[in-house]
């Protein structure tokens, strides 16, 4: 079994052919000749490289977007990514912030770090509170799964911190769901698909059966399911053939960095009360009792950058 961002990427690849031709069933061929990676994968690699290299995130996103200009970006993001200058964030609450955030969940060593890095990963484009919230909920679900929390505990934590309604059932959602690319209209559904699943593959099948923005919903679900179950090696091997060399390299380097980081599942070490109605301050998600201060986080990122330079 393999755990990591490959789980999110597989969700994107499997869901790619259903984005505009929804399949409201869990019974479908998992991978076909027309399956491909999309903007979800490209942006996931950009965030992974940002975490590894401690680079400017806006430049990472723009660089990766320009490598793959036809990956299927939304209109506002395309305008932002391909402009000659780095434009300010455009107050989006679209699920683009959640689709690219899985590396944060696998990289973070504390719940608070997951919160802060998810916020940073979103706000360069998706600085609307719901856009930030969707990224944080996804990253924190992944972190909690990595920390060994049960599905019940993950559900309770996400409901508590983010206020999502996770009591619905996929069968009920499926009958009424319409295409919704907002965080608030797709992230809760993706999490519910994970909560109802039995293993990694069933999680992806449930996510796609919802309909709507299938590749992104499956990408979000896939990241969480990968952290919780792991991904079967044979499935990783199959999907590997759909990926370009730079995508594979990004995944490999990111995995090497994450393997050296020790996770802490101590929620009590990070006591804070989120308020998504208020403006975000740079240090809002850090308090004096947290396990990792902003300065310590910066020092850690500097160490990782030095490690990567020596490695090359």
PLM regions and their residue ranges:
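Structured, active/binding-site neighborhoods that engage oxygen-rich ligands
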Residues: 1-312
